[in-house]
Amino acid sequence: LGTLIAVFAAYWGDIRDMVVEFFRGIGDLAHRSTPTPVPPARRLILLIIVGTLPLFAVLPIRKTVQGLGDNMYFVGAALIFTGFLLFLCDRVRRGRKTERSATWLDALLVGVGQAVATLPGVSRSGMTITAGCFVGYERRFAVRFSFLLSIPAVLGANILSIKDAVQAGIVGAEVPMYLVGVAVAAVTGYLCIRLLKYIADKGRFGAFAYYCWAAGVLTLVLQGIK
């Protein structure tokens, strides 16, 4: 939930425009009319919908995927894999696509990256930003689309988590601790988004590769010592 708040704070302008355009789109459907060209905010809504579709393929195996988090060898290898993707990201030719020119296939491929990122140890933002760069997105748009694409995913994950918590029985004494966690996640998430925007301008996503490699190797070493 904290991550969702951070995205809303960082991209409120885009979210507001999409909400407005969503209702305008309903009105256009009622009148059987389509504006030409399609407004950027409306195209962005459609791109996000297409990018979210691959997640539905993961739902039937959600428990199995989550179970991989207990295998630290898998998590370590996934971190190293993420590092290689980020390293390659800076070496891809800079794209120019934004919501005005990105295709449905582009969005679908980024969505596949997001589905792969449900695997423990694979960074969701790292995977989707890298996928965006690979399909030719302008770097700042790759970051923006990555986080806007996270809204349906994070919202769905929170709904499932709340459902599980209700079934397990929520302890009232734990609510304040949960709220503190949400606040910390919101602040941290917002700062991370600002940092990624800065890195997008500088074109240095590969700097995160070394962090992922170090974390991955450390995970494998510590697991091997046990």
Stretches found by the model and what they are:
Residues 1-226:
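Multi-pass membrane proteins that catalyze or facilitate reactions on polyprenyl-/lipid-phosphate substrates
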